[in-house]
Amino acid sequence: MHKSVLLEECINNLNLSDDSIVVDCTLGRAGHSSEILKRIPNGFLYSFDQDLDAIDSSYKRLSEIRDNFKIINSNFVNLKEKLNELNVYEVDAITYDLGVSSPQLDEADRGFSFHKDARLDMRMNQNQDLDAYKVVNEYSKEDLIRIFREYGEEKYAVSIANGIVNNRPITTTLELTEIIKENVPFSYRKEKHPARKVFQAIRIEVNDELNVFEKSLYQALDLVKVGGRVEVITFHSLEDRICKRIFNEVSKLDDNLKKLPIVPLELQPKFKVVANITPKTDELDENNRARSAKLRIIERVR
């Protein structure tokens, strides 16, 4: 069973009441959605996912709790559009868990894992055209270097990109992993897995994860009611920087206004940052994937 990271902290900080209207932007295997649903007997839950396998599994799990939910088969970049289509224009709480779910990592045929052999894929939405195979085999060397640096913060981006271009076509995850290993120093291989950052970078490129998240988060802030909260669990610094920047942007008073003796209400920030939470030691001991997790929480105040 997939273990949701920071589950208790996330649910307890949503400030749910019996009749809350809640959006889970990342349904996955319903770890968060199922706990939310238990706490809103008179409310409603909207859960987004573009992975049909996840939707099928989670629908059964949620149906065993109660029926006041709707699963929306869409990327959360369409958050506002899809909710508006259902005549939903404001909600009490919105949550994101940006980690790749354990089943996606563990199911070899999805091509996310550098430990298991599979065709290069990495698509969250299995209906889209762009996949990891196309990135690895069709992108220019310059574009590969760019995404490895920007999305993987990989210091050996140039040598890895050269190795990929010189060994095309590359079909499977383990082929790619071996090429990465061959193009980094031996000492680097003894640290964390040498393919980790490159696989992250390719996955982000395939799914346009950073742009999609930024657009969606602004929509979430527009949708949440006064007193409502938006929560984001991130697993790497790229996502966390975006979240931190946007939360600071909407919660900080403009420098010029700080000089005023009294700041008019309409010029004060609409949000306040509530907390930044990292996993406790016992969760880190139980779930290795929690190591890099961070939960950021913001609340609408006007």
What are these regions (language model features)?
Residues 1-302:
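S-adenosyl-L-methionine-dependent methyltransferase catalytic core, i.e., the SAM/SAH-binding region
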